Amino acid sequence: MRKILLQLFCIACTLNVMAQNGKNNDKDHYLNQTTLQVTKAGTLEQAFADAKPDNCQGLCVVGPLNEADMRFLAKLAKPSGKEDLHSINLQKAQLERVPAHWLQGLAYVTHVYLPTTLKEVGAYAFANTNSLCKADLPEGLKSIGECAFVGTGIQRVNLPVSLEMIGEGAFAHLKSLTEVSVPAANEHFDIVDSMLIRNADNTLLQCFMKGKGQVQVPEVVERIGHLAFGGAKNISSINIPKSVTAIGEDAFASTYALETISVAEGNAHFASTNGVLFNKDATLLICYPTSKRGNSYAVPATVKELATGAFQECGGGNAYKHIKDKAEKKRAKLNQVTLPEGLTKIGKWAFTFSGCQVNIPSTVREIGDSCFFYSEIEEVTIPEGVKRIGDGMFAACYSLATITLPSTIEYVGAKIMAFNYVETTLNVYAVNPPTCHRDAFADFASSINLHVVKGKKQAYEKSNDWKGSVFNDIEDDLKAIVTGVSATAPSSVEAVETARYNLQGVRIYAPQRGINIVKMSDGTQKKVLVK
C-alpha cells in the first residue's frame, strides 16, 4: 500500500495549562538547565540528592537508567507547579523502556527527549500530560502501548522504521497535531486518507482528520480500534464498510459535530438505523451521534445494552457548535432519551457530558463507572437489582438534587457526587448499610439529607462508611421494600418520591403548603395537598 506523508494544518492551539507562562510552547526554555550523570541504574535519586541543584525545571540525565529512576523523574514533576520539572532530556541516557503510566496526568511537563536505546513506551506513559508538546519517537523504538500519548499536545507523530506495534488509542485526542508520517520502509503501518492503519490485523488505529465533512473508512479495515475517532471533532458523518467485523470501546469519543453513522449493506456485524449505530441484531446500541438532530429519542425495545460512551456529549455543550442560529440549535438539541424496559446494562460514560434527561428502566442490573458524569440530570432512581454504584457515577451533575438507591445496593464507589453544589436528598433502601469506598463522598461541596428505612437509622449512624460532615442528618422514614428481585431478573417495586414541584413548575426540596406536584420513581406524577 502506498505510503504518504500527511500534513495537517490547524490553528495554533493555546494549551489549557501553560507551563511556560505564555511563551511559545514549541521552544524549550528549560533545556539542559541541570545535568546529572549516573554510572549505575537505580542511583538517580541519590545523585540528585548529592548534587542539590538550585533549579530542576529542566533536567538532562546521562548514563544508565531503570524503572526506579524513571519513577523518580515523575516524582520531580508530580507537584505540577511552575517551579517543578518541565523538560526531561534523556538523549544521552541508556534506557530501554518508558514505564506504563509514567507521566500520566502531570500538567507541567512540556518536553521529553527520548534516547535511541529505547525499545518500548508503556501503556498510558504520557496519557493526559496535556502540556506535552514534544516527544519525538527515536529510531530503534519497537512498541508503543495503548493510550500512550492520548490527550497530549504533541505536534508531530513521525513513526520510525523500526516500529512494529502500536496499541489502540495511543494517539487519540491530540489537540495540537500538525504532522503525521509513516516511512515507506515500515511495513507494519499505513496512512490512508488521514487514517493510521495497523497492517497485522487491519485495524484502524486513529483518524487524524481535522477538517469537516464525511469519513469513509477504507475497505481494507476489519476492526475499528478503541478511541479510533477520538478527537476528530469536526467530521459530520462516518461510513463503515462491510469489511468491519469489530469496533473497539468508545471508538467515536469526542466527535462533536457527528450527525450520522452509516453501515454498508452486506455488513454481517453492524447496522445503522436513522444514523444511530447498533450491532446487527440491535441488542447493543453502540453510538448515538453527538450532533444528531432531534429533541427526543426512544431507544428501540430490542436493545439490551448501551455501550461505553453510547450517548456521551449528546445534547451537551460541545454538541451542535456548527449550528450558529440559536433557534435552530434549540430545535436540534437532544433533551430526552427514553430507555426501554428490557434494558439490562448501561455502559460506563454512557451519558457523560450529555445534556439530556434519561430514565432508568426497572430491568437494568448494571451501570458503569462515571455513567452520568457532568450530565444535566436532575433526579435519578436506581432500580432494584443493581448492586453497585460505580466511581464518579453522579460527579459534576450540578442540577442533581435527588438520588434514590435500591434495597439491593451493596457498594458505593469513589467520589460519586464530587464537584456537586446542590443540597441533595439521598434515599437509601438498603437495610444493611452498603460498603463505601473511603472517598465515596469526597469533593462533594454541599450537604446530604440521608433517608433510610424505618428502624435502620442507628445502623447507619454506627457505620463508619456513612459518617461525615456532608450528612445533615439521618431520617429513617422510608418504607422497607420487600421483593424477590435478583441481580438478574426484574421485579415490581413500590414507587417512591423522586422530586417535588410547586404549581409553577419550580423544584422544591420540602413539602410546601398548598398543591405540590410529586414525581414518582415509576414515572407517574400526582398532585398532593399539603396543609
Residue ranges and their predicted role:
Residues 1-25:
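Bacterial Sec-dependent N-terminal signal peptides
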Residues 2, 517-531:
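C-terminal tail/sorting-segment detector
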Residues 31-39, 57-65, 81-97, 107-120, ...:
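Structural signature of tandem-repeat unit edges
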Residues 43-52, 68-78, 99-102, 124, ...:
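Short, T/G/N/S-enriched strand-turn elements that build extracellular solenoid repeat scaffolds
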Residues 462-484:
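A recurrent domain-boundary module in secreted/ectodomain proteins
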Residues 478-504:
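Residue-level detector of functionally pivotal "anchor" positions at catalytic/ligand-binding pockets or at interdomain
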